[in-house]
């Protein structure tokens, strides 16, 4: 799964809501997966909304797709989720 941060540590929008046109993920089964940033955010946002941005109820070491994670315990305002690569690969993409 890919970690998608949507609120930065200072509480502002993060890279998935930024100005880049594309996001590249380093992969093992092929070198790079390149997707449109806006399409990625639209997909992730929809999945987060379907869950009402709910946090994971699993232990911290078990990744739950599209659950909201944060580091508020450490005084940080960031929020992120884990997006399965299978979902990301359904977006229009380039494998390099």
Regions found by a protein language model. Name each.
Residues 1-96:
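Nucleic-acid endonuclease domains
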């Amino acid at each position: 799964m890919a970690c998608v941060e949507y609120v930065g540590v200072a509480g502002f929008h993060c890279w998935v809501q930024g100005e880049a046109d594309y996001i590249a993920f380093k992969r093992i089964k092929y070198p790079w997966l390149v997707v449109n940033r806006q399409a990625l955010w639209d997909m992730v946002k929809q999945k987060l909304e379907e869950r009402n941005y709910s946090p994971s109820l699993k232990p911290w070491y078990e990744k739950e797709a599209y659950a909201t994670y944060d580091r508020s315990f450490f005084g940080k305002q960031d929020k992120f989720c884990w997006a399965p690569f299978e979902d990301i690969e359904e977006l229009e993409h380039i494998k390099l």
